[in-house]
Amino acid sequence: MMGDKDITQVNVFFQNWKGAIAIFNKFTSSHSRFVIELKQPNSGEFIGVSFSFCNYIAGSTWWENCDLKCFPWKSPDGKSGYEVRDDRAGFLIRGTDSVVIGDGDSSTVSQAHPLKNLSA
């Protein structure tokens, strides 16, 4: 579950990557885990962002000039979670566990770290 501090930190991260290229990287069904790659168009730096226990994904698989934002969300069965969207691109993802920034080898930047249960 992500708390208010988690949502705030994810949004700070997304603000730093505003304008990046967003690319579908992978989906792992065992944990309903979806990974996108954010890539800086001029420097070539990129980082993976993993969304765990997703129950809704909609939108493009590749878009430029991303502007992702994270919001609190409740699942139909009442679990607290997150909603990440880019309204201009028509991208939306909802999940009930965590957002992890810096997915293993999917990073070239030093800011890669998990954002999970920071407010617990």
Predicted regions and their residues:
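Surface-exposed, interaction-prone regions used to assemble/regulate multi-protein complexes
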Residues: 1-120
